[in-house]
């Protein structure tokens, strides 16, 4: 049996990441979310950006606690060799780790790579992740003639991912508002 008196005294926390509160004002989903958040004793946003979204919706007293990540993984020799085989003697070495969806702006990265090649002909860009944009990005890579300079890895082990991150010079992750979707605080920024 649950003691209802204890439950009534228990403080409730609600963590918001931006996507779940970024619904049209006045929509039924917006009203339900605001009602639920209004019942929480503490509302915690994962970023200042998300806090601002919440304040615009009328939420009050939002606290910001940025997410963390696990301690760095010790990279195995196998993973180091894997990443050396991918990057070779490239310079600079760029990387993105994320889902392949519109709000991540991968198509803009590929177009930027194309524009950077005259100045950096040995550039290598690695994208690790999979998603709805997979076929579009494969097609765009081919259309732009980037097969030699762009590696799309759709499935990798954690060791391979960390090995590639360790070998890279620049972590690339633009974020755009895509329809009503926005990246509030990408965890991969911290992992990189």
What are the functions of these language-model segments?
Residues 21-27, 55, 69-85:
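Acidic anion/phosphate-binding donor-loop and adjacent secondary structure
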Residues 97-102, 116, 131, 156:
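Short donor-sugar binding/catalytic loops of nucleotide-sugar-dependent glycosyltransferases
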């Amino acid at each position: 049996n649950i003691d209802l008196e204890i439950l009534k005294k228990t403080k409730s926390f609600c963590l918001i990441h931006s996507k779940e509160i970024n619904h049209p004002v006045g929509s039924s989903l917006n009203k339900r979310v605001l009602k639920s958040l209004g019942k929480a004793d503490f509302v915690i946003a994962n970023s200042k950006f998300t806090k601002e979204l919440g304040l615009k919706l009328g939420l009050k007293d939002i606290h910001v606690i940025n997410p963390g990540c696990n301690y760095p993984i010790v990279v195995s020799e196998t993973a180091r060799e894997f990443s050396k085989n991918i990057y070779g003697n490239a310079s600079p070495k760029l990387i993105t780790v994320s889902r392949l969806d519109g709000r991540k702006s991968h198509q803009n990265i590929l177009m930027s790579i194309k524009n950077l090649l005259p100045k950096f002909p040995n550039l290598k860009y690695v994208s690790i992740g999979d998603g709805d944009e997979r076929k579009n990005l494969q097609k765009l890579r081919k259309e732009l003639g980037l097969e030699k300079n762009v590696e799309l890895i759709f499935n990798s082990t954690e060791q391979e991912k960390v090995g590639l991150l360790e070998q890279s010079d620049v972590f690339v992750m633009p974020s755009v508002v895509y329809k009503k979707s926005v990246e509030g605080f990408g965890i991969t920024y911290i992992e990189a």
